[in-house]
């Protein structure tokens, strides 16, 4: 077996015995591979450092040019604020973008309260006040009376009317609650609805047959109560339902007397618009106009007193 030297394998030359490296590929013969490798190494040693430095500088220059071009394009693309309309458009776009980003919190509806245990009277009355319909329904479903009351003879209907809990009022009336049930001061449900300023409840009560002329212990009608408490919508509805504009309470005061005494301008205008009597006298012999003059003179006296005191204080300060 013929043994070849490494030199002969690389160069492809014949050995001393005259055997040729015929098994080598053609491009590796006659020393071409060796010469090519040597030349390649020499070229690398000469050109690599210079080329790498040059390429790095060119790359940095091109990056700077690219950045400058991008900045120029961005400046050109920016909208110019030529008028207030442009500014308003930009503000609206920013608001819209901010609105899209903000997440709307999902509010979970409270689960309906399931009542299993019996409900006593105090809890039932409190539930009517606090608008807890399941508690009220449980009490009524156990065949209890809807007209149970507290120590002041106030029923669940009175409490619900005061707070304006329409669903509970409807439920109590379906269960047979008495609309004309009177508390210790002989107020009925419509008195309590007007006291709370709940026009929707008042309308429901009147539609169900509540007496618009009902009076309490002070002989006040629901219109008296609405005027005193300043609930305009309730007073307006009562007048539309033909409530007595000139009804007198125990002191002989009409709703207009009360409106003037409490200086409720809108109520005065409402009552006068629908024909309230300006000349009717109360038990003290005073008409609504007399009360106006009395109020004006009283106010004038207060202002005169304040002016006089201010004048005296200013004279003392000068000494």
Curated annotation (Swiss-Prot):
| Ranges in coiled-coil conformation | 53-89
Organism encoding this protein: Mus musculus
Signal peptide location in the record? none
Q: Which GO terms label this protein's molecular function in UniProt?
A: DNA binding; histone deacetylase binding; p53 binding; R-SMAD binding; RNA polymerase II-specific DNA-binding transcription factor binding; titin binding; transcription coactivator activity; transcription corepressor activity
State its location(s): Nucleus
Indicate the quaternary assembly: Interacts with TTN/titin and YBX1.
Here the segments flagged for biased composition (Basic and acidic residues) are 55-65
Recorded protein name is Ankyrin repeat domain-containing protein 1
What Pfam families does the database record attribute to this sequence? Ank_2
Q: In which tissues is it expressed?
A: Expressed in heart, cardiac muscle.
Write down the InterPro entries for this protein, in alphabetical order: Ankyrin_rpt, Ankyrin_rpt-contain_sf
Where, in residue numbers, are the ANK repeats? 152-181, 185-214, 218-247, 251-280, 284-315
This molecule's function is given as:
May play an important role in endothelial cell activation. May act as a nuclear transcription factor that negatively regulates the expression of cardiac genes.
Which cysteine-cysteine pairs are annotated as disulfide bonds in the entry? none
UniProt keyword Metal-binding, yes or no: no
Query: Main location per UniProt?
Result: nucleus
Entry keyword DNA damage = no
Print the keywords alphabetically. ANK repeat, Coiled coil, Nucleus, Repeat
Q: Give the region (Disordered) as residue ranges.
A: 46-65
Biological process (GO) annotations held by this record are: cardiac muscle tissue morphogenesis; cellular response to interleukin-1; cellular response to lipopolysaccharide; cellular response to mechanical stimulus; cellular response to transforming growth factor beta stimulus; cellular response to tumor necrosis factor; cellular response to xenobiotic stimulus; negative regulation of DNA biosynthetic process
């Amino acid at each position: 077996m013929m043994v070849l030297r490494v030199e002969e394998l690389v160069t492809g030359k014949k050995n001393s015995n005259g055997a040729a490296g015929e098994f080598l590929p053609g491009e590796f013969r006659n020393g071409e591979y060796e010469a090519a490798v040597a030349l390649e190494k020499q070229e690398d040693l000469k050109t690599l450092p210079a080329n790498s430095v040059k390429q790095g500088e060119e790359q940095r220059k091109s990056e700077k040019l690219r950045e400058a071009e991008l900045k120029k394009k961005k400046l050109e693309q920016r909208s110019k604020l030529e008028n207030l309309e442009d500014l308003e458009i930009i503000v609206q776009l920013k608001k819209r973008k901010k609105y899209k980003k903000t997440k709307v919190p999902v509010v979970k509806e409270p689960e309906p309260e399931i009542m299993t245990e019996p409900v006593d009277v105090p809890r039932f009355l409190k539930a009517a006040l606090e608008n807890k319909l399941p508690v009220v329904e449980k009490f009524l479903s156990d065949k209890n009376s809807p007209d149970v009351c507290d120590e002041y003879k106030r029923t669940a209907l009175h409490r619900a009317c005061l707070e304006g809990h329409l669903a509970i009022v409807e439920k109590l009336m379906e269960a047979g609650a008495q609309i004309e049930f009177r508390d210790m001061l002989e107020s009925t449900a419509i008195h309590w609805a007007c006291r709370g300023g709940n026009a929707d409840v008042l309308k429901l009560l009147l539609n169900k047959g509540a007496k618009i002329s009902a009076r309490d212990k002070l002989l006040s009608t629901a219109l008296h109560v609405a005027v005193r408490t300043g609930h305009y919508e309730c007073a307006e509805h009562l007048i539309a339902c033909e409530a007595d504009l000139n009804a007198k309470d125990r002191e002989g005061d009409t709703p207009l007397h009360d409106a003037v005494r409490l200086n409720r301008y809108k109520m005065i205008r409402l009552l006068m618009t629908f024909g309230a009597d300006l000349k009717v006298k109360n038990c003290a012999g005073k008409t609504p106009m007399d009360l106006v003059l009395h109020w004006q003179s009283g106010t004038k006296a207060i202002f005169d007193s304040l002016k006089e005191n201010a004048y005296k204080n200013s004279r003392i300060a000068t000494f």
